[in-house]
Amino acid sequence: MRTALLLLAALAVATGPALTLRCHVCTSSSNCKHSVVCPASSRFCKTTNTVEPLRGNLVKKDCAESCTPSYTLQGQVSSGTSSTQCCQEDLCNEKLHNAAPTRTALAHSALSLGLALSLLAVILAPSL
């Protein structure tokens, strides 16, 4: 009995705790300091950042079973962007896209609006 207990204790020490990933989880750039222990099936911390001209910077951070890094530049009129970043270390997604580039998004919106109004004026202006 004593030998079985010693063997069980040695086995528990040798195997150690299960390896789980810790990631920051949030749905906006203002509250991205919340960290969680991910489910055992999650191998990645994933950060998705979408910049839309009228809505600004939309950030989503979470645990993910799979993750494919990407960068997408949307059409010239919307001039939005979307990116996904992946990492595999504890709390590695802390600083990924936390800064909200709202000034840039607003500048793009103003430029798009100016171009649209100029085009409209040219189309609707009477011939000179």
From Swiss-Prot:
Chief place of localization: membrane
Topology of this chain in the membrane: Lipid-anchor; GPI-anchor
Disulphide bridges, residue numbers: 23-45, 26-32, 38-63, 67-86, 87-92
Tissue specificity comment: Expressed exclusively at the outer cell surface of transitional epithelia and the keratinocyte of stratified squamous epithelia.
Sorted UniProt keywords: Cell adhesion, Cell membrane, Disulfide bond, Glycoprotein, GPI-anchor, Lipoprotein, Membrane, Signal
InterPro entries: CD59_antigen_CS (IPR018363), LY6_UPA_recep-like (IPR016054), Ly6D (IPR042339), Snake_toxin-like_sf (IPR045860), Toxin/TOLIP (IPR035076)
Top-level taxon of the source organism: Eukaryota
GO biological process: cell adhesion; lymphocyte differentiation; response to stilbenoid
Domain UPAR/Ly6: from-to ranges: 21-108
Compartment(s) where it occurs, according to its Swiss-Prot or TrEMBL record: Cell membrane
Lipid group attachment sites (GPI-anchor amidated asparagine): 98
Span of the signal peptide: 1-20
GO CC terms, sorted: cell surface; extracellular region; membrane; plasma membrane; side of membrane
CDD domains: TFP_LU_ECD_Ly6D
Keyword hit for Protein biosynthesis: no
Name listed for the protein in its UniProt record: Lymphocyte antigen 6D
Organism: Homo sapiens (Human)
